[in-house]
Amino acid sequence: MVEHPSAHERPITVDSWLVWATRMLLDLDDPAGREARGLMASLLGSAASVVTRGASPLPPELADRYVEWVERRQKREPFHLITGEVPFFGNLFSVRSGVLIPRPETELLVEQVSVRTKSCPPQSILELGGGSGAIICSLLLLYPGASGVAVDIEPDPIRCMLENRKRLSLDSRLHLLRGNWDDSIAGGLCFDLLVSNPPYIASAEIDGLMAEVVQYEPHRALDGGVDGLDCYREILGSKIDSRVMPGGLMVMEIGAGQRWAFERSGPFFELEGFDPAEVVSDWAGHGRVVIWKRKG
């Protein structure tokens, strides 16, 4: 637990609060000093303020909040749930309890879409399992002429996407639907681009994840069944891929050990009406993004 400083030993300056917080966070897996500075940067509004205000007193109301944040982080609550926002593809997104925190590796999905649609930008985008909305909002910001639909079955992601839609001035271009993936979309409606980052962690592996994930992130957004592939079977087996226009793309994130399922001998390599799947590796060499192009 956090040792609340007594009145006579309470830190005064920003720098002295950083020393205290670093000491309190030494048991974390991440470097304590970096965590302490990151929380302070969010508190003050920028990393530069941590430097320029280092010798200045931290106002009492901010000091109280900093103590609360450090205590929450010491209990392994994720950094971005404490601050309430996360950077993704050049923008800040709101995040909240009950919503999967966007990961840096997911930016590869957005990058691949950007690279492959330069000559023919999508006009309509569908995301299955919208979560925070980081993927579809980033894509809509890349393509000012596009509109999008995001589907999620849980209320917390819908609320979070509403916040980010407003935050990024996308109210008129992003439509949100709550429900099962295909059942929520009007019959016959097709899109130039379908994207998804579905749950892909094998059920037996969930409890072995970091405490921040196991204790604070929604298991429904993580658990992909016995082999982690249940949601891909659901998406591809329900013919929701027919929602992709001729010439359009279907792009999904996969787990680090799932490349085999989408390459030549895998069950998802060839889909009727699509070119064979292409697997793109992340910076660590793991298959991370799968791309299918609809023929026509």
Stretches found by the model and what they are:
Residues 2, 38-115:
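Conserved AdoMet
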Residues 39, 76, 106, 135, ...:
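Residue-level signal for inorganic ion chemistry
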Residues 104-208:
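Conserved SAM/SAH cofactor-binding pocket of Class I
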